[in-house]
Amino acid sequence: MFWIKTTLYQYLTQKYGQIQPPADLKAVGSPVDEAEYACPDPDTFPDDEPLKRYEEGNSMVGMKQDILYFLNPLAAEPCYYQVDLDSKAFMAYAKQIDGTPNTVLSAIMLKMVSRYFSIKKDQHISAKIADDYRKDIGCGKSYRDFVRFIHVKYDREMAEESIEKLSQRARGAILLQMQPENSFEWYRRVAEARKGIDEQPNLRSRISYAQKHSLYKSDARDTYTVSYVGRTDWGGMADYITGVYAITDGNLMLEVNALPDKICVTYQVFDRDSRPLDLFLQILQEEKLPYTVSERMVRYMPDLQLPKPKAKHNITQGTFEK
């Protein structure tokens, strides 16, 4: 995000003149502080056990869609919708029920899923919520990818509860799993996986090792995902931005960004069926939350091929070896 801001700031100032920069703007040519690429040493972490672990197992609700897509991606047409929520109204609603954007959207998605899928009595629905844990491990200024997922389990019968009650359930699960001990444990696993990748002799074997030992591959399977890691400071650039939408790869996945006047939701699905979106909007209407929504848009993901490195890259330390 740092360099997206820099590029956008360059473009806007060249076009419109001087604009108040965000506090964390990285100017072209400015020195890179060591803290910006910091990587922690897991051996320095305390060995305390977390109070809460997620051991509830996978959610089978919606898995058929995911499996069919990954078996034959060409048979589907991944798409997304831009849903804009009025920031003032949404945050007032969240405050009134003692919720957060993550917990409120998780509760709304639960109700949507319960109306969309035929859920068996013994099945449960679970939410995956992104957690930026860089501060827990002492790397608050680092722009490395320090994100893990928190899981919130709901029983089928809970879908009849109010958004307020469901939001409280989600918040309780989030608070327990956001303990620093969970972050220490997760990063130890990350460091171990990276060490294994670095030990491989060539790029092909590194890719193979990474695929077989992916931490997310062994993580719990959830019904839907909500990814909101906080409001971004755009400075004076916010006056020129009409929306911020992150496009990723996932089904029933909400990527959420915030501007001063609106919360921008990228509502992503694997196919052209509009019912998941329609039900989501229906619940917004029931809760009297104002919104606007775009037409369906095809989700094109970049197909990148990395160049062959001239030196061996150590991903654990972020360095190249001769």
Regions inferred by a protein language model and the residue ranges of each:
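Gly/Ser/Thr-rich phosphate-binding loops and adjoining beta-strand/alpha-helix segments
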Residues: 66-134, 226, 263
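Short, charge-rich amphipathic segments
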Residues: 35-47, 92-108, 208-224
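Acyl-thioester-dependent acyl-group transfer interface
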Residues: 115-322
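Acyl-group handoff/entry surfaces in thioester-processing enzymes
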Residues: 1-32, 91-93, 185-189, 239, ...
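Non-catalytic, low-complexity flexible loops and terminal extensions
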Residues: 2-89, 284-322
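Generic alpha-helical secondary structure signal
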Residues: 2, 49, 84, 88, ...
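Structural preference for long, well-ordered alpha-helical segments in enzyme cores
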Residues: 3-12, 101-113, 170, 276-288
